[in-house]
Amino acid sequence: MKYPRIFADFHNADEQGRLRLNRVGTIEDLSRQNIKLEDGQLLALYDEELEVDGVVQYSQEESLWVAVIDWKQIRQVEDMLVQAIV
């Protein structure tokens, strides 16, 4: 299943390894796609080189939205482009 693709900064993780969804590129993608974040929502998170599926959660500690990801499931974007061509 394809999930909405939202920019995320893979260097902007909290202490639990969740990606913070508060960068300008993230906010722009959410706005452009009219997405309102909700607990349990599934997203495809990407940057210039990487992509991974994640589950949205609200961080009470930081008062912002985060995405729980499996760091072992991160895919290289280049690999995905090559597979699409083949």
Question: Can you describe what each PLM-predicted range is?
Answer:
Residues 23-33:
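Short alpha-helix capping/helix-loop boundary micro-motifs
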Residues 36-38:
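Short, well-ordered loop/turn sites that connect or cap secondary structure elements
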Residues 5-8, 30, 61:
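Cystatin/cathelin-like cysteine-protease inhibitor module
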Residues 42, 46-52:
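Short, charged beta-turn/beta-strand-edge "cap" motif at the junction between a beta-strand
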Residues 2, 64-86:
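Glycine- and charge-enriched low-complexity intrinsically disordered segments
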